[in-house]
Each structure stands twice: as structure tokens, then as C-alpha cells.
Curated annotation (Swiss-Prot):
Family membership: Belongs to the ATP-dependent AMP-binding enzyme family.
Record keyword Ligase present: yes
Name this protein carries in UniProt: Crotonobetaine/carnitine--CoA ligase
Keywords in alphabetical order: Ligase
Species this protein is from: Salmonella schwarzengrund (strain CVM19633)
Annotated GO biological process: carnitine metabolic process; fatty acid metabolic process
Length: 517
């Protein structure tokens, strides 16, 4: 089944501009409250100007261009402008430091970068040490440094024609993007994403949330992340909806922004839900137009119930990863939710639970979640320049090993247990970090929690809890360990606890466990 119909991203935007014209496509709000708005026709023109800018700078089909930007309209211009001329976007996590960013530039052989003044000093140093092929930088901002090889993005873009001047032959199988994984446990891998992948993501995710052209989809997820691109932007544009992109998340402002833009769909991660819940309750909490809140793991039942009751919303669980492109297992708008299930497998996919010998397991037994799709179409094509890593993750028949543990029930609903690499081995027992975090997060004094395994000479690993307390609270070790002993099996009780003011996170909200020991 080919629901994309051979359409690449260039054709998509030309069609969207023709069909929806003056309808609002994109609204962007900066941290300072400055709002920029684009219709489908005007956004397509901005994309064409950006494509022509890249062509003028020597970029051709197959060339790779890096973007290191916070959320902004220019990210959207560049993403689709590169796709229109067959070039490849390499988005860089906005929180990465110099060595990490240089590693991505080197491994993807990027010669041109688009970034902002905020990140420019880091790239000036990278260029000076000649460790990467980077030789030109397009800078977004008011001031342009007097350095060779630096251009002013906005000035150059404004001079370009709104009609595309370079139209190489494109196939849906062409690479549109190399998206490096977050690398919370190891070096990131470059996930190769095709035009087909992105077109499919638009249709699939629009189906998943029953998106219509009168919907308003608001997100604060970082644009360099798969969630923003494939479960928010692509479905919003594919359905002819209005896409609202916020520069950064603010717990104090978020719910007001939901009301301001009359958002009908949004997406949240656990950190957002927890920080929204500690905001003072207001009579306007339930005054909104939201019909669905896309939600990504993990949240305890108590937290879920408290959030949905206070704000009068439904959480639509969606499970996926960069390699699956979309949430391949999830709830559906018309279905009754079966919490804590992560839902059922979506169309165009198959899912199984397998044991360590790669054999399918019956209902109720815990094993690895494996997904079957079509590489380069419904799941990622490959890891860039890493054939061995690709072979480990992706079987020739299209089965993807997710590295996640879970099980399914007799009715085909799936349940997430934990990342397999996130299991702590303690004296012969496997302990799920997620299970412990969900239990401990129910403590009324605790705002945020993560547990990790640390080396133990006797029992393989000991369990350590890192805790962030609610403002003004104190928590003794005796009180903490007593709570754990009363709520979990003895072998699961942490051996150590440490109170912190915050936890290290990447831009998608994931806790960077390798920074905690």
C-alpha cells in the first residue's frame, strides 16, 4: 500500500500552497512574545527563497547542510528548502557543545551550517581548528561578525526569487534528512530519513489523531527532534491545519498559549505535565479547546489521573522512536483508553514481543518490542555510514529491534516496561528503572526522580535515586527509604539517594543518565 503516491516534499508544498493559499499554515511565538505568521502560500514562497539561497551558495542535490537552531520559522524554511532541491538536512541538538557538534559535522561531512548568534562562537572555534569540513556559516541574527566565510541568512534570503530556480529530479526514496539520535547512553547514530518517510509520517500521524484542516496543532517540542517534525509539523501541514510553534517551553505561559491560539491538539512529555501540575490552580484550567494531548512515556497512574482531572483533557499515548519515524503503537481518538497500555499497533506496521533468542513470546510474557515496517518508507532507511549498527537493529525482512522491554495482552494492547539498557541487574533480579521512578514520583514532596544503576561488587549493581524536591520541601534519607520500603519489593529499594536542584536533560526532555552516577 503506497499512501504517499510518489509525491516528494517539493510536490507536497507546491500542492499545499495551491489548495490552501491564504489559510494560516504557521504561527511562531518567540520567548519575548513576538508573533510571526505565514499562510500556506507565503510559507511556500519563503521555502522557495531559502532553497534558492542554498543553491546560490553552491548546495546541490545530495549535499548535507547542518542546522543548529532553537525553534524558529527559519528552521521550517531551511528544512523544506533543502528538500526542494534534493539536499539533506542535518539538524543538531541545540544543547550540544562544541566537541559533540563537531563530531556530527565530521561524521556527516557537512560543509555549510545555518545557526544563530547564540551558537556562533562555538562554530568559530570549530572552523579555526580545521577538524571538520565546515567552511561556510549562514547566520541568523541582527549583527554579522567580520569573519570570512560567514553570510547573513535573512539578507541573502530576502534577495532571492520566490520561484524555485533549481529543480533536480527527485524520488520519494531520496534522503531528506540525517537525524542524529539523542545519545543519552552512547555516541549518537545518524538516522537516515527519506522523502517517503516524511510524507508517510504526515498522513499516518494525521490519522492517529484524526487531524482536520480546521485543527490548530501547538507544540513546544524542539524542531530538530523527530516528535516535532513527524508527529506535529508533518501531520499539521499534510492535513492543512494551522501549526503553532513556540520557541521554548514555559510552564507559567503554556496553558495561556493553549487558550490564546485556541489549540485543539498539543503534545506533552512527563516533565511538562509535572511542571504544569505544580503551577497554581486557576478557574481557567479547563477553559480551552483541546481535544487531544499527545503523550510520550513515562507517567504514573496517579500523575495521569491528577492531570486529566485538573485540566479536563484526554492523554493519547504514542510510542515510537527516531527509527520508527512515528508513534507506531498508540491510542486512537475513538477508543477507550486502557491505561497503562501504550495502545495498539497502527496501520502499515506489525509488532511482536520476542525473547533473547529472537522468538515470538505469548501474551503476558516480557520481552523485546519488535516492529515490522518497510525501511525507507514506514521506518528509517539505515544508520548513516554504519552498516554494522544497521544490521544489528534492522533485520532484512524489515523487523526493527527497539531495545525496549514490554509485553502485550490477549486483546493486542501493548505495555511498555523499560528500555532494555535501562534495566538494573541486582543480585540476579532485573529491576525496571521506570517502575521505580513511577512509584517514587507518587511521594508528595518529590517533583522529579530518576534512578540509575551503579557498580556493586557483590550484587552486580546497586540502585541510586536522584531526586528534585518541590519548592520549599525537605526530605530525610530515613523518610525516603521508609517510603520505598512500604511501596516496593525489598530488592527494588534504592541503596542511595541524592537530592539535586535539577536533573540533566537534553532538548527533548530526556534525562541524560550517563551524566548521573
Amino acid at each position: 500500500m503506497d499512501i504517499v503516491g510518489g509525491q516528494n516534499l517539493r510536490q507536497m508544498w507546491d500542492d499545499l500552497a495551491g489548495v490552501y493559499g491564504d489559510k494560516t499554515a504557521l504561527i511562531f511565538e518567540s520567548c519575548e512574545g513576538i508573533v510571526r505568521q505565514f499562510s500556506y502560500a507565503s510559507l511556500n514562497e519563503e521555502i522557495n527563497r531559502t532553497a534558492n539561497l542554498f543553491y546560490a551558495l553552491g548546495i546541490r542535490k545530495g549535499d548535507r547542510v547542518a542546522l543548529h537552531l532553537d525553534n524558529c520559522p527559519e528552521f521550517i524554511f531551511c528544512w523544506f528548502g533543502l528538500a526542494k532541491i534534493g539536499a539533506i538536512m542535518v539538524p543538531i541538538n541545540a544543547r550540544l557543545l562544541g566537541e559533540e557538534s563537531a563530531w556530527i559535522l565530521q561524521n556527516s561531512q557537512v560543509s555549510l551550517l545555518v545557526t544563530s548568534a547564540q551558537f556562533y562562537p562555538m562554530y568559530r572555534e570549530i572552523r579555526q581548528d580545521n577538524s571538520t569540513p565546515l567552511n561556510h556559516i549562514c547566520l541568523i541574527g541582527e549583527q554579522l561578525p567580520a569573519d570570512d566565510g560567514v553570510s547573513h541568512f535573512s539578507q541573502l534570503q530576502a534577495r532571492q526569487s520566490a520561484t524555485l530556480c533549481y529543480t533536480p529530479a527527485l524520488s520519494t526514496d531520496d534522503t531528506a534528512e540525517i537525524l542524529f539520535t539523542s545519545g543519552t547512553t552512547s555516541r549518537p547514530k545518524g538516522v537516515v530519513i527519506t522523502h517517503y518517510n516524511l510524507r508517510f509520517a504526515g498522513y499516518y500521524s494525521a490519522w492517529q489523531i484524526a487531524l482536520r484542516d480546521d485543527d490548530v496543532y501547538m507544540t513546544v517540542m524542539p524542531a530538530f527532534h523527530i516528535d516535532c517534525q513527524c508527529t506535529a509539523a508533518m501531520p499539521a501541514f499534510s492535513a492543512g491545519s494551522t501549526f503553532v510553534l513556540l520557541e521554548k517551553y514555559s510552564a507559567r505561559a503554556f496553558w495561556d498559549q493553549v487558550r490564546k491560539y485556541q489549540a485543539t491538539v498539543t503534545e506533552c512529555i512527563p516533565m511538562m505535565i509535572r511542571t504544569l501540575m505544580v503551577q497554581p490552580a486557576a478557574p481557567t484550567d479547563r477553559q480551552h479547546h483541546l481535544r487531544e494531548v499527545m503523550f510520550y512515556l513515562n507517567l504514573s497512574a496517579q500523575e495521569k489521573d491528577a492531570f486529566t482531572e485538573r485540566f479536563g483533557v484526554r492523554l493519547l499515548t504514542s510510542y515510537g522512536m527516531t527509527e520508527t519515524i512515528v508513534g507506531i503503537i498508540g491510542d486512537r481518538p475513538g477508543d477507550k483508553r486502557r491505561w497503562p497500555s501504550i495502545g495498539r499497533v497502527g496501520f502499515s506496521y506489525e509488532a511482536e514481543i520476542r525473547d533473547d533468542q529472537n522468538r515470538p513470546l505469548p501474551a503476558g510474557e516480557i520481552g523485546e518490542i519488535c516492529i515490522k515496517g518497510i525501511p525507507g518508507k514506514t521506518i528509517f532507511k539505515e544508520y548513516y555510514m554504519q552498516p554494522e549498527a544497521t544490521a544489528r537493529a534492522l533485520e532484512p525482512e524489515g523487523w526493527l529491534h527497539t531495545g525496549d522491554s514490554g509485553y502485550q495482552d490477549e486483546d493486542g494492547y501493548f505495555y511498555f516496561v523499560d528500555r532494555r539498557c535501562n534495566m538494573i541487574k541486582r543480585g540476579g533480579e532485573n529491576v525496571s528503572c521506570v517502575e521505580l521512578e513511577n512509584i517514587i514520583s507518587a511521594h508528595p514532596k518529590i517533583q522529579d526522580i530518576v534512578v540509575v544503576g551503579i557498580k556493586d561488587a557483590i550484587r552486580d549493581e546497586a540502585i541510586k535515586a536522584f531526586i528534585v524536591l518541590n519548592e520549599g520541601e525537605t526530605l530525610s534519607e530515613a523518610e525516603f527509604f521508609s517510603f520505598c520500603e512500604n511501596n516496593m519489593a525489598k530488592f527494588k529499594v534504592p541503596s542511595f539517594m541524592e537530592i539535586r536542584t535539577d536533573l540533566p536533560r537534553n532538548c527533548s526532555g530526556k534525562i541524560i543518565k550517563k551524566n548521573l552516577k
